[in-house]
Amino acid sequence: FCSLAPIHASVGSYNNHWGVPLSLARMPEQSRYGVFEVGMNHAGEIAPLSDLVKPHVALVLNVLPAHIGQLGSLEAIRQEKLDIRRGLQKNGVLVMPYDLERSDIDDVRILTFGFDSSADVSAVMRLRDDSMSVEVTIDDKDYQYELSICGEHLVLTSVAVIAVAYALGADIAKAVSDMTMLNSPKGRGNLLSVSGRVVIDDSYNANPVSMIHAIKALSQRAAGSRIAILGEMLELGEFSDELHK
């Protein structure tokens, strides 16, 4: 969005009841777009933060078993994350994965994204030696771009960003062309060259699904020795032993 208009965005993990108000307070008056991360690790935290932000477009990127120890189930996590729509402005848009249950949502406009061809913003990806090739389809029009990041989940994140741009009425061709400059934050699937070896650094955080994505990304690399160094996954509560297995 930086090339489309003046923008302000949350830094780091400023996504809680301290970070969101601080990010809002720091937003320059001339900003046309504001991007705010809203997070939670307990029930009832998303809606109040969304009410503060009052977004025109709200994005639910995924529903994973992170914090399942506190919320108890994936369904509880889904409901909590979808509460981000509570703060949407009139005629606002909820952007969400195509394969996420949405039959109980009838109070906002929904825009879906995903690898399913029935999604409003659908994508096909192809693995190359050192990049991912992505083709996105919106309103029967195709857009293509390359990503120098590794992992299906990171490709899906880029598709979600394009869906948000579409929901905002932004220049899609420009947004797609800017995807080639996308780099993952440190520890989020970065490709590193160390002593002639390729290292995939996905060390920022871990939950069962993100761990599976990381291992899948490793398995898709070119033939040769593959070594996975895995840490523990936290905040899984009573499900910890089962999910680690």
For the regions a language model picked out, list residue spans one by one.
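Cytosolic catalytic headpiece of P-type ATPases
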Residues: 63, 133-134, 157, 187
